[in-house]
Regions:
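Bacterial Sec-dependent N-terminal signal peptides
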Residues: 1-23
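Short N-terminal segments immediately surrounding and downstream of signal-peptide cleavage
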Residues: 22-38
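Short, solvent-exposed loop/turn and secondary-structure capping segments
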Residues: 37, 56-57, 82, 92-97, ...
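Histidine-rich, glycine-flanked metal-binding segment
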Residues: 35-79
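Active-site loop-helix segments enriched in His/Asp/Glu that coordinate
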Residues: 130-166
Length: 166
């Protein structure tokens, strides 16, 4: 049951923060940073879909008028999104079905292969992985001496242009 509430809060956290015109502030949560540190009673600000501030709320002064919305999330834990490196996520669906495998070309030297344009934003697997906290993937081709060019993609996007991380 706690897992369900965590995913609901996390989805709300991302959805609301992306739509705001001014920064959105989340107060009081325990922030787990990517380097392993933990900040109790954190103040987390998001603007245009990106985290622009993570600080200890007891050590900074916050102007409430600078934020569009302030959420009090005391007792909750917030984690950064995960990044999966060196994967075929989005360029393969079912390994047993050759037609759904876009990760390998014939021949051993294929520097022209670009996973950027082969990425499938409608992948069912990517949606499942995204619901577990993975939001960015390095999609990499396989096979051969020179396999091609990898791409770093957002798992949320309408097409490959939207999904490309630039």
């Amino acid at each position: 049951m706690n897992k369900k509430y965590f995913y609901l809060l996390f989805t709300l956290f991302i959805t609301i923060a992306v739509q705001a015109q001014k920064p959105t502030l989340f107060m009081g949560a325990t922030a787990h940073l990517g380097n392993g540190t933990k900040i109790e009673n954190a103040a987390i600000s998001m603007f245009n879909g990106k985290i622009d501030m993570v600080a200890d709320a007891t050590r900074i002064r916050i102007d409430p008028s600078a934020f569009d919305t302030i959420y009090r999330v005391h007792g909750k834990h917030l984690y950064p999104a995960f990044i999966v490196p060196n994967t075929t996520l989005g360029i393969t669906e079912i390994d047993a079905v050759r037609a759904s495998n876009d990760y390998q070309e014939t021949g051993s030297i294929n520097p022209n292969v670009r996973t950027l344009i082969a990425y499938n934003t409608d992948s069912k697997i990517a949606k499942t992985v995204r619901s577990n906290g993975v939001f960015i993937a390095q999609v990499t081709p396989r096979g051969g001496t020179i396999s091609g060019q990898s791409s770093v993609m957002h798992l949320a996007g309408w097409n490959w242009e939207d999904a490309a991380l630039r």
